[in-house]
Amino acid sequence: MFRLFERLTWLAGGVLAMAGAGPAMAQETPKHGGTLTYMIPADAPPSLDGHRETTFATVHATAPFYSVLIRINPANPTATNDFACDVCTEMPVPTEGGKTWTFTIRDGVRFQDGTPLTAFDVAASWQELIAPRPGVTSARVTYFAMVESVKAPDVRTVVFRLKFPTSAFLPALADPYAYIYKKEILDRDPRWYETHILGSGPFRFTEYETGQSISGVRNPDYYHKGLPYLDGFHAIFADKQSVRIDAMRADRAAAEFRGIPPAARDQLVKELGDKITTQSSDWNCTNMITPNHSRKPFDDVRVRRALGLAIDQWNGAPALSRIANIKTVGGVVFPGSPLAATKEELQKMSGYWPDIEKSRAEARRLLKEAGQEGLKFELLNRNVDQPYKYVGTWVIDEWTKIGVHATQRVLPTGPWYDALRGGNFDVTVEANCQGLVNPVLDVGKLLPRSVYTENYGFFEDQKLVDLYQAMVFEPDPTKLRVLMRAFETYALDTQVHALVLPWWARIVPARSYMKGWKISPSHYVGQDLATVWLDR
């Protein structure tokens, strides 16, 4: 693998829009006690292992049970470079020119079974994340190409040695899925955590009913003194938005932490008044349509381009934004970032032309040229309504306007991931969502699967890799923007490896008695619930 992160400049995504419902409140004194009930908008996670999975269904269900080494500062979750220790004692100053990072691990941290968490557990967990043994999957191996070794010389010290200094290291280290597991268990069965839970976080695991609910109680041995405030939590899986909204309306649930569309927010506010609050943010997340290049006729760029030309993004996004969690037409970069394409730049690429009739005429011409008039195929989708199923229904309708007929196969989250990873699909609706806004890192999703394991296009493209590496090595923001346009144009227009659909907008509703939670541009961050409290 090439040196993916050498000299990477960590570029934030510009100003992140944040808003809350109602005026700012004075600082309140948190109260202890009570059980928080919240909704998880999915049927079930494919597994419980944070190292393996990339879905919110896993992190929303399991983050309260686990510790991490470092994280985005919980008091400042919109930041892209404000990091805080969790099981370490303080953020270290690197040595050897930024190539050695030495962390001191807290004393007194215990797993749920009462055994102490030591530096050996931290090192073992990170070794599995960075270089998993055969038969074990880590979804973020690519992020850690800069790491040479992770070692624990004693029970309180973990040392990361890097191949080269890079400002990408700390953001990668702060991944919210990077749970600390017990070394003894990893040594015995490295896949144990796919179906079991044993952590050292603010809550202790009590019960999991697959696809139904998961529960935890306050960890009395939690090392952040005074936390958590809650006695426990109960999370309910529900893939239908109507079920989740009804639960909040009837106060059977206090919150949903992923996001709802404006129409649902307006409905709740109208019906509940000051009994409901909402927080809003830009969302570092977008759906993509990914053709499986290993299946005909999707190995033909003419067919892939035709699918993109059929979709009227400029008129579709405003209409869908009222009923779905989508908002902004964009390319591969988070809108608002200095590296994002302007509207004029986007409209030069196929799939973004302002004249939809011209686009569709070209799409029909390409299909005829490729011998694919009347093309029929199956669109794989995830059984999550917001916004997956809305987006799937939309693009299927758009494709009929060029004579293409797709049927939608909707699978629960676990089987959907199995189909993606196994290549068992023609074309799929998927997403590119990240914990931090970092355009150069974020667009790695478009790289070939041999470089980025969570790419499901099943293609190889050395030129795309070379274009990406040119960005990685470019420190000048102006030149980097030019390189990003070249990467984007090649990926989305020249080769059409994927179709990027409108970026999402995040609205998180909560009963007004739920306090202590702050929104961020990522629905992965801030889900351990340690600071949440109930004002009742």
What are these regions (language model features)?
Residues 55-56, 60-64, 198, 209, ...:
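Detector for C-terminal structural segments
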Residues 70-78, 171-228, 232, 242, ...:
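Gly/Pro-rich hinge or "lid" segments in bacterial periplasmic/extracellular proteins
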Residues 27, 31, 104, 117, ...:
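Surface-exposed binding/hinge segments that line
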Residues 129, 149-151, 206-217, 234-295, ...:
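Extracellular/periplasmic solute-recognition and catalytic clefts
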Residues 37, 118-125, 155-161, 201-202, ...:
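Alpha-helical secondary-structure segments
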Residues 90-136, 153, 159, 244-247, ...:
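Aromatic- and charge-enriched surface segment that lines or borders ligand/interaction sites
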Residues 39-96, 127, 196-199:
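N-terminal lobe/hinge region of extracytoplasmic solute-binding protein
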Residues 114-116, 121, 242-253, 271, ...:
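Short helices/loops that flank or line small-molecule/ion binding pockets
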